[in-house]
Amino acid sequence: MAAPASAAELQARVLELLAGVAPDVDVHTVRPELQFREQFDFDSMDVFNFAAALHTGFGVDIPERDYRQLLSLESCLAYLGKQLGAGKPGP
């Protein structure tokens, strides 16, 4: 799958995948700076499933040692942005 064209597109796709893992979450109320577990019921199995969804959705390998970077929307977007080169300004 192609990398998102912008940071906004990346965020929209991540929130869509998050909703698939945690369907009871209203993704419009997710606060980017707070860890998911502080905002809603999100346990270690959810983190694993979220990492798997991100892998499938973006085609990015996410080693288990990097799962801690997926614990908030802000850190997840930063991690994926580095992996995908998304949201970088053009020349």
List PLM regions with ranges.
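Phosphopantetheine-dependent thiolation modules in NRPS/PKS and related acyl-activating systems
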Residues: 2-42, 49-51, 56-91
